[in-house]
Amino acid sequence: MSESYNHIFVSLRPMTAEMYHAYYKEYQNDPDLYIDKSKYTPFVYSPEWVNNYIQRQISRNRKCFAIMLRDEMAGEIIIKNIVPGKSAALGICMKNAHYKDRGIGTQAERLAINYVFNELDIPLLYADSILTNTRSQHVLEKVGFRLLREEGDFKYYSIERSP
């Protein structure tokens, strides 16, 4: 799965254990995304943490993809809560600030939506965003998600496949 727009070439590749370790060695969590800033602590790479994370993804029957900017891993997209033929949910995380505000996440979300609708044959996709993540909310709305509701610290979205 790939897409090129404004000379930015983005593709999605299934995540491998090696890719996860490479990703998290360079990962930086964003303090601006914490509602309670006192709970923020910088991410510190740990091989054990990454191995446990991989096992959680496998045990939850998720489809995990690396967001590739040419040959660089820019982030991760996860298709989760999969109910075959009915619905799934989308999650996205960029590796660090270098990959934000460049259209990479937008292209990756478009590719993921296409994959869910056409490859998995799932007609309904959900996503959510914490209230403070206005960047994510903008991208979700830009690619066609519609706001369902605001509840607690989150906004909930959905997009349906066209008939």
Give the location of each predicted region:
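Acyl-donor (CoA/ACP) binding surface of acyl/acetyltransferases
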Residues: 1-22, 26-33, 64-163
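Residue-level detector of secondary-structure transition/capping positions
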Residues: 31, 41-42, 58, 148
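Conserved GNAT-fold acetyl-CoA-binding loop/helix
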Residues: 32-53
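Short secondary-structure capping micro-motifs at structural edges
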Residues: 52-55, 78
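Short loop/turn motifs at secondary-structure junctions and domain boundaries
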Residues: 55-61
